[in-house]
Every structure is written in structure tokens, then in C-alpha cells.
């Protein structure tokens, strides 16, 4: 059945035609090749915005540094990073006056949270730069290699369990004259080949101890690894993003938590809330501005865009901000909060894989790794790259990294930078003129409302806001920001016109088949349609069309057309046979060639439950047989989570209900990784999995509380097994012989 996708817009009000301007269905663009060029671009741009600042050489790392704070004020409209510290502090003073006690309460809460945070908080997070192997690893692995390497240097803070002692270790590690650590080296072995003459060279990954000097270690700790941002739509050029190492992560966490406590209590902040809560906050802000508008006056809204938000901000401003916010806190906590900005103002960017060059005859290609970029004649590069390298030269270090003291990398201090933006919005007026401004800020995105008696005064207010932002190192783009009468604007991809416009086109890419398995995909598909009806104003006719489109897509994906259709194919043969032999054909799942009985009333019910009473008994028995080897009962209990990719923004986690049946299979992981040096990671993971299974066998409770106390897992398990054995022995469930054997085993482990 072919359906015209534009039927999706049958019953939608005209403003929602915005949905038709987001034709984001296909695959987004992914980057390939080297990201070095994009990273160098970022380094050059960041320094250009700060080039009139104070320049000096770092005593510790020997890197070229630039400090743009209190630099010359701009005379044109070009972006600049010259934030004036006294202006930043004054803006925060005003925020403190407007919200009495907010800073103290936020600091107190952040401090109390820090005291009870355990090291395992750092295992959350995706890729983390691992200083022992100089590449990205999953956060948990990077933390593990750091802790095991720290132990070699008598730094055992992590064993205490708290984040604070581990952070103390990090500070101590920066003072050690040299650091010993475990790294992975490949040893090449020549082996005679079995099936032919000659030799095979086998690479064997070995864990070896290595050591580096203090300066080398500090440089690694301050390094950010850079990659190219993938799946970014609507842009011709890709851009670079950065991953911090484990040394920086712990300190950033606390500062962000402090800023989050502040953002939660600022009505102008679009973080950390999202979804419908954010819409409510926005609607309140609009209503408030309209009600404050002078009689006969005018209210304008600027949909704002900031030029290079991250690259014009400066860690030194953030240092001043944390110092001001934590003014009444104990000195140790103030010091703790100041570490992240200090580390960031000395950061070093790794430049990635390097450039590819071809020989003059165009026959040979070679990759030039970053340390060697300047060791070959510049004329070997193309013009564009040559120009980049010339500008990069002053900030280049011989290890193939670049010093990057000004600017922040993407996504590092979202909350704290939001506080800075809100501070600018909170000033409201300059020099008691006839206008008032207010607005909303969410990381680098903002909306500005201005009330005044006429349009000219509104424009004056907007210009004053523009200049105020310049003093804080924020550059509002005059080209990309646009102004309307209040009641129509866009903020964080939410379009407002006398209320929020339904915009489910953002979700269109996620309407497809998720590709988990047949059972989960059906549940996810229906849940997404349900969520869009609840949250994004999708109407009933649209939803009905979406269901039909989804079912068609699902049948094509899994080759499971209806049993009475004319489609041929291997799977269809089996499905047709099942169709012929089934009485209750309505009871067959769509994946087994059954009809679709989903409609708007039953979207929330898993398909197996919906069709349960319509199934033939023998079909039901096969589908839901607990001993059926294809039924993954353990992994499919209760509520599941799936990753959903909307057109804008990060991947979202979504809960869905599914009932396990023969269609709930799980695929095995790709094992082609086995011969690489990642193999150690997998073996370690398997080891952890075995430990956790053992632990679960000893403590078979459904929910684990967060462990408190200083017991190791081994002690806890031995203790529990001793108790269990004694209870079993005393109640007669265990013979004396077995009891003594059990105790002897526990004795061998060293616990009795």
C-alpha cells in the first residue's frame, strides 16, 4: 500500500507548516578521513578572536599562552573574546541581589553532593581520552587504567571510594617528578606459517610498565582529544569536538553541578529542564513580558544567535565566576571549584591523525602524523593546508599538539556558560533608559524580549544588550539574529507563535524501524507515535497515517508481508504456510504475516498482549514457550530502553514496554576485534562480567542499594556465603561434610 507522506499534514494548523521545512528523513552526513584540518581551524579561529590579549609562555609546559581577559574593547562588529572581568563580576553581583541566597544555597548543595559522590560517577560518560594509551576509551576503562596506574605511584585515594580522595590523588600526581603507568605495547613475533611456506608475523599485545617525566605527564593530563562531529545536518563543513581526559572530568563535574543548582532556580535558564517543562517555562516568560509591556507600547523578541560561543568564552572568566559564586564557602571547596577552569586555561589540543599527502607522480599516498607536520617542506601541502599550518606555527608543540589557552571546547561547561548568558539578560536596562529587556538562555542559544514605548527605543535596548554582551565575551550575531513582535520566535528548535507550534518533523527520522529486533521494533514504533501525539501536537489523522507508514516500513524491513499477499520470497513461503494452517489469523503477529490491528486507541499496548486472546493455542504455545531457546526471557523483563535519534540534538533514551516472545532475539557482538590491542579491554570486560555474575549469585536481591562502607566485593561475598552455609547447616539443608568442605574453600581464599 503506497501512502503519500504529505498526508501526514492533513489536520495540522497552518503554523505547523514549519514541519514541512524539515525534510530530515535520509541518513545524516558522517565524516570520514582525518579531522586534523577542522581542529587546526578551531585553534586558529580561537586565537584570532583573542590575539590582542596578553601573550606569554607557560612556566610548566612551555606552551604559548594568550590571555584575552580585560583586552581592548572592539571598535567594530567582529567577534572578540575580550571579556572585562569587573563587568562579569558586576553582572553576577546583580544576579546575587535579584536572587538573595541563591549562590550560597547552590554552593552548599554542590559541596554536600561532592562529599557523598563516589568515584564510579566518572564511569558515566561516553568516550574519554586515556592518557596511558593516548587515545579515546570508554569512560569506565579510562578510569580503570588511571586508577591502576595511580596505584603504581602510591596514590591509593580511589580505594577509599569517594570522589574527593581520588581528585586529591590527581592533584598529587601533577607534582610527582615522574609517573609510572601500564601501557599496551605490541610485540611482533615471527611464526612459521602452517599452510604455506614462509612466516607469519603475529602481533601480541602486552601490558607493560612505562614511565614519563612530570612535564610529559602534565601535558597528557591537560590534553583534549579531538574528533569530527558526526551526523550534523544543514552544514556544508564539519567541525571539531573535543574529549577531555579523566583528570579534568572529576573537577568539571563539580563545577557543572554547582552551575546546575543555579540554573534550576533562574527563570531565564533553558537548562537543565527539557521537553514540556521547558515549554512551560518559555510560555511563562512570554506571558510575563507581554503583561509588563507599557500601555500603548511595543514588545519585540529577538531570536538570537551567538557567533562562535565556545571560542569567544574564556576559562579565566569561569574562574572568576566560580570564585564569586562560592564566595561564602569553605576555602577547600573554593579551591576545588577553581581547579577545572585553571586546567582549562592551560589546555592542549591533540590534532588527530594528521594529513594525507600524495607524491608528485600521484602514485603514492602517505599519512603525515601530527608531530611531523612541519618536518616536510610546506610546498608539499595544498594551498589551503599551507595557509593553515603557517597560522598554526606559533602554537604548535613538537609532540604534534597545539596550545589552546583561550576558548572552551564544545559541551564542556554548558551550565556555567548558561549562567553567564543569564547574567547578561538579568541586567535588564542600562542607564535608566525607557526600555526593559529579559530573555531565555540555553547554552549558546538565546531569545531576547524587549519592551518599550516605541520601536526606536526597542532598537536602542537591543543595541545596548549587544554591547553589554561584548563586555562579557559574548558575541551576538547581527547577521543571524532576527527580530519580530513578541509572540513569534524560535528558541532551541521550538517554534512559538501564540503558543508552541507542533513540530513533529524533528522526530520524523525516528519514525522508522529501530532495528533492535522484531518485538522491540514494533513496541518502539508505536511508542514514538504515541509520544508525538502527547508532546508534539500530532493530530489523529496524522497519527493514523504514521501507523500505516510504520507498518509498511516494518513489513518491508523484516520481509513479513501479510499471509494473503502476493509477495514472493523465502520467508514469505514459511509465512504463507503458517497462514494456511492457522484458524485465528487475527492472532498472528505482524512479524508472522498477521494483520495490523493497531489504531489510535491501543497504541500503548504491546502487540502480544493485544492479540493474546485471538491466537491459536499451538501458535501461542510456540510463541511464548519458556523453554524455547529463541526466547530471551531474562533480557526482556519489564521496561526496556532504546536509543532514538531525532533530527536535531543528541540521541534520546526512550522507555518502551515489550513482552518477550520468539521475536525477542538478541544478536551476538561482532568479534572481529579479537586480534587488536583492544582485546585486553574485552578480556577485562568479560572478567568484570564474571565477577558481577558471581556477586549476583551471592546477593540475589532484585535491587542493589548503593554500597556504603569499606568492604571489598570479595569480603562481602565470602561473608555472605559463610552466613548462608551456616544457616543451611543448622536447618539441616546441608550435611556436615558439605559444610566443612564449604568452609575449607572459603579458608583457601583467605577468608574464614
From Swiss-Prot:
Source organism of the structure: Influenza B virus (strain B/Ann Arbor/1/1966 [cold-adapted])
A GO cellular component annotation in the UniProt record: host cell nucleus
Alphabetical list of InterPro entries matching this protein: RNA-dir_pol_NSvirus, RNA_pol_PB1_influenza
EC number from the UniProt entry: 2.7.7.48
Domain RdRp catalytic stretches: 286-482
GO molecular function terms listed in the Swiss-Prot or TrEMBL record: nucleotide binding; RNA binding; RNA-directed RNA polymerase activity
Similarity field: Belongs to the influenza viruses polymerase PB1 family.
Principal EC category: transferase
Disulfide bonds: none
Pfam families: Flu_PB1
Subunit structure: Influenza RNA polymerase is composed of three subunits: PB1, PB2 and PA. Interacts (via N-terminus) with PA (via C-terminus). Interacts (via C-terminus) with PB2 (via N-terminus); this interaction is essential for transcription initiation.
Entry superkingdom: Viruses
Region of interest (Promoter-binding site), ranges: 249-256
Gene it is expressed from: PB1
Cited HAMAP family: INFV_RDRP
Post-translational modification: Phosphorylated by host PRKCA.
GO BP term, example: symbiont-mediated suppression of host gene expression
Segments carrying motif Nuclear localization signal: 187-195, 203-216
Protein name as annotated: RNA-directed RNA polymerase catalytic subunit
Broad class of the protein's primary localization: host cell
Chain's role: RNA-dependent RNA polymerase which is responsible for replication and transcription of virus RNA segments. The transcription of viral mRNAs occurs by a unique mechanism called cap-snatching. 5' methylated caps of cellular mRNAs are cleaved after 10-13 nucleotides by PA. In turn, these short capped RNAs are used as primers by PB1 for transcription of viral mRNAs. During virus replication, PB1 initiates RNA synthesis and copy vRNA into complementary RNA (cRNA) which in turn serves as a template for the production of more vRNAs.
Catalytic activity entry: RNA(n) + a ribonucleoside 5'-triphosphate = RNA(n+1) + diphosphate
Keyword field: Eukaryotic host gene expression shutoff by virus, Eukaryotic host transcription shutoff by virus, Host cytoplasm, Host gene expression shutoff by virus, Host nucleus, Host-virus interaction, Inhibition of host RNA polymerase II by virus, Nucleotide-binding, Nucleotidyltransferase, Phosphoprotein, RNA-directed RNA polymerase, Transferase, Viral RNA replication, Viral transcription
Amino acid at each position: 500500500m503506497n501512502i503519500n507522506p504529505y498526508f501526514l499534514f492533513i489536520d495540522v494548523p497552518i503554523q505547523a507548516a514549519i514541519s514541512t521545512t524539515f525534510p530530515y528523513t535520509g541518513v545524516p552526513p558522517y565524516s570520514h578521513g582525518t579531522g586534523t584540518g577542522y581542529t587546526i581551524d578551531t585553534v586558529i579561529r580561537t586565537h584570532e578572536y583573542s590575539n590582542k590579549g596578553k601573550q606569554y609562555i607557560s612556566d610548566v609546559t612551555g606552551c604559548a599562552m594568550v590571555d584575552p581577559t580585560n583586552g581592548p574593547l572592539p571598535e567594530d562588529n567582529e567577534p572578540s573574546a575580550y571579556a572585562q572581568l569587573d563587568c562579569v563580576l558586576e553582572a553576577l553581583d546583580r544576579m546575587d541581589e535579584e536572587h538573595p541566597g541563591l549562590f550560597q544555597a547552590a554552593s552548599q548543595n554542590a559541596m554536600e553532593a561532592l562529599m557523598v559522590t563516589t568515584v564510579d560517577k566518572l564511569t558515566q560518560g561516553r568516550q574519554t581520552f586515556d592518557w596511558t594509551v593516548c587515545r579515546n576509551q570508554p569512560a569506565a576503562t579510562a578510569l580503570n587504567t588511571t586508577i591502576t596506574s595511580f596505584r603504581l605511584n602510591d596514590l591509593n585515594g580511589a580505594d577509599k571510594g569517594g570522589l574527593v580522595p581520588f581528585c586529591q590523588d590527581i592533584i598529587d600526581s601533577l607534582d610527582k617528578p615522574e609517573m609510572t603507568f601500564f601501557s599496551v605495547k605490541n610485540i611482533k613475533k615471527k611464526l612459521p606459517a602452517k599452510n604455506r611456506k614462509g612466516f607469519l608475523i603475529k602481533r601480541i599485545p602486552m601490558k607493560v610498565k612505562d614511565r614519563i617525566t612530570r612535564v610529559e605527564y602534565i601535558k597528557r593530563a591537560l590534553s583534549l582529544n579531538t574528533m569530527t562531529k558526526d551526523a550534523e545536518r544543514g552544514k556544508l563543513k564539519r567541525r571539531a569536538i573535543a574529549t577531555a581526559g579523566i583528570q579534568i572530568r572529576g573537577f568539571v563535574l563539580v563545577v557543572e553541578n554547582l552551575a546546575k543548582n543555579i540554573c534550576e532556580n533562574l527563570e531565564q535558564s533553558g537548562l537543565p529542564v527539557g521537553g514540556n517543562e521547558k515549554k512551560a517555562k518559555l510560555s511563562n516568560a512570554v506571558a510575563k513580558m507581554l503583561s509588563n509591556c507599557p500601555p500603548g507600547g511595543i514588545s519585540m523578541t529577538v531570536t538570537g544567535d551567538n557567533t562562535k560561543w565556545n571560542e569567544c568564552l574564556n576559562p579565566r572568566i569561569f574562574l572568576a565566576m566560580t570564585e564569586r559564586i562560592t564566595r561564602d564557602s569553605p576555602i577547600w571547596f573554593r579551591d576545588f571549584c577553581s581547579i577545572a577552569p585553571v586546567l582549562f586555561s592551560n589546555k592542549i589540543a591533540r590534532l588527530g591523525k594528521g594529513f594525507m599527502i600524495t607524491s608528485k607522480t600521484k602514485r603514492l599516498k602517505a599519512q603525515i602524523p601530527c608531530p611531523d607536520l612541519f618536518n616536510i617542506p610546506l610546498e608539499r601541502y595544498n594551498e589551503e593546508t599551507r595557509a593553515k599550518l603557517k597560522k598554526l606555527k606559533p602554537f604548535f608543540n613538537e609532540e604534534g599538539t597545539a596550545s589552546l589557552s583561550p576558548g572552551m571546547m564544545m559541551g564542556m561547561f554548558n551550565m556555567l556558560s548558561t549562567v553567564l548568558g543569564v547574567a547578561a539578560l538579568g541586567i535588564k536596562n542600562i542607564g535608566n533608559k525607557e526600555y526593559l529587556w529579559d530573555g531565555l538562555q540555553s547554552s549558546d542559544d538565546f531569545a531576547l524580549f524587549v519592551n518599550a514605548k516605541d520601536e526606536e527605543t526597542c532598537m536602542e535596548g537591543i543595541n545596548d544588550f549587544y554591547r553589554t554582551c561584548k563586555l562579557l565575551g559574548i558575541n551576538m550575531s547581527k547577521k543571524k539574529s532576527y527580530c519580530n513582535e513578541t509572540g513569534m520566535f524560535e528558541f532551541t528548535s521550538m517554534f512559538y507563535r501564540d503558543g508552541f507550534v507542533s513540530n513533529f518533523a524533528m522526530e520524523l527520522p525516528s519514525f522508522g524501524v529501530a532495528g533492535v529486533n522484531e518485538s522491540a521494533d514494533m513496541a518502539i514504533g508505536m511508542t514514538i507515535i504515541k509520544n508525538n501525539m502527547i508532546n508534539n501536537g500530532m493530530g489523529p489523522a496524522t497519527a493514523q497515517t504514521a501507523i500505516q507508514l510504520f507498518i509498511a516500513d516494518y513489513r518491508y524491513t523484516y520481509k513479513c508481508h501479510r499471509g494473503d499477499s502476493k509477495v514472493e520470497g523465502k520467508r514469505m513461503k514459511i509465512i504463507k504456510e503458517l497462514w494456511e494452517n492457522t484458524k485465528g489469523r487475527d492472532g498472528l503477529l505482524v512479524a508472522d504475516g498477521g494483520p495490523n490491528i493497531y489504531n489510535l486507541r491501543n497504541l500503548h499496548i504491546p502487540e502480544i498482549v493485544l492479540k493474546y486472546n485471538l491466537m491459536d493455542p499451538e501458535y501461542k504455545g510456540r510463541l511464548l514457550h519458556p523453554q524455547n531457546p529463541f526466547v530471551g526471557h531474562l533480557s526482556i523483563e519489564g521496561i526496556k530502553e532504546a536509543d532514538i535519534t531525532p533530527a536535531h540534538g543528541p540521541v534520546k533514551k526512550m522507555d518502551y514496554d515489550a513482552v518477550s516472545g520468539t521475536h525477542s532475539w538478541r544478536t551476538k557482538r561482532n568479534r572481529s576485534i579479537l586480534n587488536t590491542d583492544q582485546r585486553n579491554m574485552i578480556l577485562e570486560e568479560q572478567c568484570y562480567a564474571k565477577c558481577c555474575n558471581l556477586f549476583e549469585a551471592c546477593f540475589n536481591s532484585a535491587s542493589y542499594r548503593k554500597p556504603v562502607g569499606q568492604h571489598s566485593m570479595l569480603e562481602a561475598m565470602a561473608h555472605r556465603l559463610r552466613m548462608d552455609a551456616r544457616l543451611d547447616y543448622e536447618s539441616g539443608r546441608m550435611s556436615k561434610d558439605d559444610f566443612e568442605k564449604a568452609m575449607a574453600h572459603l579458608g583457601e581464599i583467605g577468608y574464614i
